[in-house]
């Protein structure tokens, strides 16, 4: 399945963050030829799909000489240009898990150019709320700030059963920035990328929270 085939209205409604990541991959011509599995297995630290799928704990079905197995998307890239597939294995399908009712996601990135560029930093968020808009789950995955996707730890303990507020966002931003292990290159310094990761994490959270909140209000009507 090519990336363009993945970009359909049902996905945008169910997992808008994943759809956003798909839509940012290359031009229309590239999207018509590249595959989602290929983007994962290419194992670029700057891949758009990796954080967007990892934050929702998506899985892959892998076929090989020893039969069928499953693994988390986040376990496939093991370093720049390296993946965990064994000889003769390939990805058969990608599984997006069923989501709680008041859940949503988002994906944002920073690029030096506005069009057709790879991410210098990216952030994905998955959030679940209850009817009172208290946070029940909040996951953040960062891209292009380490050899592989960074699934940030220590956030759920901080936010559980709380309303989203500026203080929480600031604390999460600091955690995200300190979780980075980026390189210096022409697209950004270590300090810049670490700072931007915290900023993008806040933006991703606000967007995902708004989408989940909209579901609560829509159902209430």
Where are these regions (language model features)?
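C-terminal structural segment of proteins
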Residues: 1-221
């Amino acid at each position: 399945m090519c990336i363009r085939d993945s970009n359909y209205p049902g996905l945008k409604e169910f997992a808008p963050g994943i759809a956003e990541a798909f839509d940012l991959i290359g031009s229309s011509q590239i999207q018509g030829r590249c595959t989602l599995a290929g983007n994962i297995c290419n194992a670029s630290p700057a891949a758009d799909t990796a954080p967007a799928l990892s934050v929702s704990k998506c899985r892959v079905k892998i076929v090989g000489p020893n039969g069928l197995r499953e693994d988390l998307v986040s376990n496939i890239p093991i370093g720049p240009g390296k993946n965990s597939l064994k000889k003769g294995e390939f990805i058969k399908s990608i599984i997006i898990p069923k989501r709680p009712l008041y859940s949503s996601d988002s994906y944002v990135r920073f690029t030096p150019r506005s069009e057709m560029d790879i991410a210098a930093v990216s952030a994905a968020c998955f959030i679940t709320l209850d009817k009172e808009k208290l946070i029940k789950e909040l996951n953040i995955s960062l891209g292009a700030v380490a050899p592989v996707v960074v699934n940030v730890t220590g956030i759920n303990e901080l936010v559980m059963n709380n309303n989203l507020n500026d203080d929480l966002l600031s604390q999460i931003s600091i955690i995200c920035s300190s979780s980075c292990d980026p390189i210096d290159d022409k697209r950004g310094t270590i300090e810049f990328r670490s700072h931007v990761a915290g900023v993008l994490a806040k933006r991703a959270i606000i967007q995902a929270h708004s989408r989940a909140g909209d579901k609560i209000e829509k159902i209430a009507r």
